[in-house]
Structures are given as C-alpha cells and as structure tokens.
A protein has these predicted regions:
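Divalent metal-coordination and catalytic microenvironments
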Residues: 8, 36, 51, 63-64, ...
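Active-site environment of divalent metal-dependent phosphoester hydrolases
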Residues: 10-14, 39-42, 65-70, 143-144, ...
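His/acidic metal-ligating clusters that form di-metal
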Residues: 110-137, 142, 147-217
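Binuclear metal-dependent phosphoesterase catalytic core
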Residues: 221, 232-279
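Residue-level marker for buried hydrophobic side chains located in beta-strands
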Residues: 5, 31-33, 60-61, 135, ...
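N-terminal active-site segment of His-dependent metallophosphoesterases
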Residues: 1-50
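Active-site-proximal beta-strand elements of phosphoester/diester hydrolases
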Residues: 2-10, 134-140, 245-247
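Active-site neighborhood of divalent metal-dependent phosphoester bond hydrolases
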Residues: 45-49, 53-127, 131-134, 143, ...
C-alpha cells in the first residue's frame, strides 16, 4: 500500500486523472488531496462531482478556494441558480466554477452533495507513515507558535496532535484551544499563510507536506541563501525545505511553461509530475 499527497488541482480534472494513471492508484492505496481542487481551470465541475463520490481511500482537506466557496455556498442553501458569488471568490475563479456547475446536468441536485462535502472539510490532518507522524496542511502553520519539543517528549506531542486533529475514521473537527504545533493556529492561517511559513528558517516540529504556494526559481534562490542551503525545488517542481515539502507546482497558472501537477508518494518521497500541457 502506498500513500500519496497532491494539492492545488485547480479544476484540471483531466490532468488529475492522468496523475492517477501515472501513479497506478489502486484500492489498496491512500490519496490525500490538500485543498484547492476548484477554480482557475476549465473542469471544476468534473473535479467536484468526482470529489463528492469517491471511495474512502481518498481524503480531502480544505484549501483557501474551498474556504471562499463555502463562505458563499453556506449562506445560500437554495441552489446554484442566482447565487451571489461575492467579490473575493469571483476574483479567484468562482464565477467560472458556478457557471461550469450550472452547465452540467442535475447541477442543483448535486449542489446538496457539494454542501455536505464542503462542510466536512478541515484544513489539516496528521497521519503516520512507518511510525513517522506527518502533518498534512493546505498552506502551512505559523512558525511563531511552534512550542512542541519532539526530542524531549515525542510521544506526548504526537498524541496531542492526534487529539487535535482529524482522521478518516473519526472525522473529528479541529479544535484550537491548547498549545502545540496546530492547537494555537486558526483555520484561516492553515489555509492562507504564505511567506512567513515558506521563508521561515525554523524547522516544523514534524515533517510537513503542504500546497498553496508554488515556489519560483527566484524564491528558491532566496530559500537557498537565507533558509536552507540544502533545499531543492523550483518552478514546476516539488520543493523540499528543511522538513517542509511543498507540492503546489503551479496549476493555478496553467499557461506558464513550467506549470505542472505534482504528487508525492509519502512512503519514499518519490515525486510524480503531469505537465499542464500534457495531453
């Protein structure tokens, strides 16, 4: 069994399907999708319909685009027709996503499945691969609030994170009322943070895999100079900085030459790519 992480598909369902074929994803495997499956690309409706009907071995986290969509959808329970999108989501692809959904058969019927699905999403999870805990999050955590010491008391910290978090079996909602890696972070931080996480020279208290921020060549040069001289990655590539692994490879900007969908096999950290231009 292999466990994979992918993020920021942004409505490129055909590319997503090609990735599933490339990794030979099967019923014994696990897939974690770290948010932002919608907006920007031409196939948001197909991606959302697939997401609301997948088997239990596929798990979704809430990204900032799901956050924007839920902010609108949760206030308009009657259906998609005539929905007021709002400026923020409209500026980030929401209008096109709603139009795409409306163009599909039974769109308003599927809307209620979509509401149920979106209401269940949380922005992070902690899983275990070979007895190693790994934090999965859409955007990142605020380094200012790191206060775990996994070297002195690893069992306590790992148990704390499990209590705070969410698992596929329990679907426990996140709470943020105690200290620790995740406990003091609000959901907005975990879905929207960028530079203060990406450019922090503080290692995360445990291995972390995140999306949201594709790393450009210029940003990687800054990381190599200021953060981690052993970092790797760059435009269109999965980044490895300290113990933080960024898997957004730029599908929000599909016309860039380097844009790709990246996927990371967490068992051995093997990388897989599908170019935005791959047909």
């Amino acid at each position: 069994m292999s466990t994979y992480a992918i993020s920021d598909v942004h409505g490129h369902f055909s590319s997503f399907e090609r990735m599933l074929d490339k990794i030979s994803f099967g019923t014994e495997d696990e897939l974690w999708v770290l948010g932002d499956i919608l907006d920007k690309g031409p196939e948001s409706a197909e991606m959302l319909v697939w997401a609301t009907s997948v088997p239990e071995n596929v798990h979704f986290l809430r990204g900032n685009h799901e956050d924007m969509a839920w902010d609108v959808i949760s206030r308009d329970p009657e259906g998609l027709s005539g929905m007021r999108i709002g400026d923020r989501w409209a500026a980030n692809g929401g209008t096109e996503t709603i139009e795409d959904l409306l163009s599909k058969t039974d769109a308003d019927w599927r809307y209620f499945d979509l509401m149920d699905w979106m209401s269940s999403l949380v922005p992070y999870a902690v899983i275990e691969i070979g007895h190693e805990p790994i934090a999965l999050v859409h955007a990142g955590f605020d380094p200012y609030y790191y206060d775990l010491n996994t070297e002195e008391d690893p069992e306590h910290d790992i148990n704390l994170l499990r209590e705070l978090g969410w698992t596929p079996s329990s679907r426990k909602r996140i709470t943020h009322d105690v200290g620790g890696l995740v406990g003091v972070h609000d959901e907005t931080t975990m879905m929207w943070i960028r530079d203060s996480w990406v450019f922090s020279n503080e290692p995360c208290p445990m291995k972390a895999v995140f999306g949201h921020t594709p790393i450009t060549e210029t940003e990687m040069r800054r990381i190599l100079s200021e953060v981690d001289p052993n970092a790797s990655g760059g435009a269109g590539k999965i980044s490895h900085v300290l113990n933080k692994h960024g898997i957004d490879c730029g599908m929000a900007e599909p016309f860039e030459a380097t844009s790709a969908l990246g996927c990371l096999r967490l068992n051995d950290m093997k990388e897989f790519y599908v170019s935005a231009f791959e047909k």
